[in-house]
Amino acid sequence: VPRQRFTEDALRILRLYRFAARFGFAIDPPTAQAAQELCAHLDCVSVERIEEELAKLLSAPAPAAYLNEKILSVVLPELSPEALAAAKPVVDACPAGAENLPVRLAALLLSLGEDGIRRTLKRLRCSNALIEEAAVLVREARGCDGSFLFGHDSGHSIARPIAFGNRVPPQR
């Protein structure tokens, strides 16, 4: 049945991952397999619908586990698997909620640089305000130090400024 539903409307694939992220449930393995096998059909879905689901997914409390590499390769072909893997912990470290979408988009798409994030978000038909805010965050984050890649987070790399929207992170 999932195959049939995903074939009827491929956006249901992204909705599946969004709801799983929002409510924290595990996706049934056959359903996940069907979603991955049919994710190429997402090419037929309007970018506005994809952007809306992606924004809601990224606004969930801890979306990283639900950022599926194969599905995102269709939705965000600009993002390499290595960049996605590096971005996942940073995305989860960012504050949740729709109001923090620019921060999470900047964390997810940091590897694209300022121009790349602008092109990608414009392709997804994001608002000009969202594009500008995310691009500025990427520019500022990349200027924090020379090791702007996530994996080198010694507490002083850009992961911290991006994750906390250039605010001082809470003490643990």
Label each residue range with its predicted role.
Residues 9, 14-17, 66-70, 138:
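A residue-level signal for conserved active-site and pocket-lining positions in enzyme catalytic cores
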Residues 69, 81-172:
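C-terminal subdomains that position terminal phosphate/3'-OH groups for nucleotidyl transfer/ligation
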Residues 31-38, 53-54, 63-73:
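Hydrophobic alpha-helical interaction segments
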Residues 17-20, 36, 55, 118-125, ...:
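Amphipathic alpha-helical segments within well-ordered protein domains
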Residues 1-31, 37:
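Acidic, glycine- and histidine-enriched catalytic cores of nucleic acid- and nucleotide-handling enzymes
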Residues 6, 25, 40-44, 56-60, ...:
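Hydrophobic alpha-helical scaffolding
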Residues 45-61, 132-140:
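Charged/polar, low-hydrophobicity segments characteristic of intrinsically disordered regions
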Residues 1, 5, 43, 49:
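Divalent-cation-assisted or electrostatically stabilized phosphate/pyrophosphate-binding catalytic cores
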